């Protein structure tokens, strides 16, 4: 029988999937009208009249980032805490720092906030760090089944694409890539978590 600590650790991938799925739904619904890399008065007007939902949505994104870091740490443990796995966790932590500081600024929104800059920080810096961390952990983990490996690499490659789209201030590119990432990523967390367990 597993210890309570073992059961808690085994839940990390599922918790990360739930948190990231909830954040993605928030982005597609309550956050979407306020989110734009070409931020304008219409976006600001939406945020001002939906401030509670806006703040709750970005709080979900902070929880998603923290759960992703927990998943990276859990995954690194499964990969044997090799040097590459340790580097991956450090890079993932840098991504969380970039994400949380950007999202905290979005939560504390006021009319003069440069929302586009906060979105770029999250979209470019955090996503690049997460994608590097994920790629390093893919390499550090031996024996992936072909389907899970292809699926996982697709997630991290799309993550790099999202960083490029955000750097280019492409709302359409960012929206399409974000949707593709989360459609793949949330179930991959569960499937990879089961295999790694």
Outline where the language-model segments fall.
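Hydrophobic, aromatic-enriched alpha-helical segments typical of multi-pass transmembrane helices
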Residues: 1-197
């Amino acid at each position: 029988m597993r210890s309570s600590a073992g059961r808690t650790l085994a839940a990390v991938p599922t918790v990360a999937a739930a948190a990231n799925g909830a954040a993605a739904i928030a982005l597609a619904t309550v956050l979407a009208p306020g989110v734009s890399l070409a931020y304008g008065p219409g976006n600001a007007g939406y945020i001002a009249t939906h401030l509670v939902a806006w703040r709750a949505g970005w709080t979900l994104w902070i929880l998603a980032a923290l759960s992703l870091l927990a998943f990276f740490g859990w995954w690194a443990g499964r990969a044997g805490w090799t040097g590459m796995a340790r580097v991956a966790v450090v890079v993932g932590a840098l991504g969380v720092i970039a994400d949380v500081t950007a999202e905290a600024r979005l939560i504390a929104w006021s009319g003069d906030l440069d929302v586009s800059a906060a979105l770029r920080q999250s979209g470019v810096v955090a996503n690049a760090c997460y994608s590097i961390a994920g790629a390093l952990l893919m390499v550090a983990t031996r024996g992936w089944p072909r389907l899970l490996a292809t699926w996982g690499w697709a997630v991290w490659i799309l993550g790099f694409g999202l960083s490029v789209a955000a750097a280019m201030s492409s709302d359409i590119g960012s929206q399409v890539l974000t949707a593709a990432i989360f459609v793949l990523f949330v179930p991959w967390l569960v499937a990879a978590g089961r295999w790694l367990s």
